[in-house]
Amino acid sequence: LWDAQPYNVEEFTAGKVVHMEGRREVYNNTPQVNQITLRLPTFGEPNDPADFKEKPPVNPSEVREYLEQMIFKIEEATWQRVVRALYRKYNKEFFTFPAAKTNHHAFESGLAYHTATMVRLADSIGDIYPELNKSLLFAGIMLHDLAKVIELTGPENTEYTVRGNLIGHIA
């Protein structure tokens, strides 16, 4: 909003549904929309932000149940205790945060969904290559992205935290 007034800033906050009319144009070989009108929904128009959010392809409770079962397939007791303790500590965040701000699994509960799909792949690969240590695969995958609950701000209007920007995936 190039010419936004103070009341626009208060009215059009992140997380609200707005109705916009605009014109698609190209600037520097990049498509953009030039806004013509912007307004809040009127009575009877869709106004629930949840209706416009990407949803996980499976029910998050199924993902939770699957991961809980897979934690018990970690046969090395110390690794299993570490995974269980950290999942307990970050339970709420892990099962609600996206896996990323943009790109892959950038939706609520995307982090848990992404982790579950990777564990499922590891389980299949472990069947094909029995010499692989499935306990190590499962524990490593389950812990690999867990720090995203510290790197990202949460499921709504996701941004990277200071730690996420400065340290991120390298720690």
Label every PLM stretch briefly.
Residues 68, 122-123:
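Amphipathic alpha-helical segments within well-ordered protein domains
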Residues 79-121, 143-151:
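A short mid-domain helix/strand-loop element embedded in enzyme catalytic domains
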Residues 70-77, 105, 109, 128:
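Generic amphipathic alpha-helical segments used as scaffolds and interaction surfaces in large
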Residues 1-50:
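OB-fold single-stranded nucleic acid-binding module
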Residues 30-98:
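Extended, charge-rich, solvent-exposed interface segments
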Residues 21-23, 56, 108, 171:
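Metal-centered catalytic cores of metalloenzymes
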Residues 49-55, 105-108, 161-165:
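A ubiquitous short alpha-helical element
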Residues 103, 113, 124-171:
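Divalent metal-dependent catalytic cores for phosphoryl transfer on phosphate-bearing substrates
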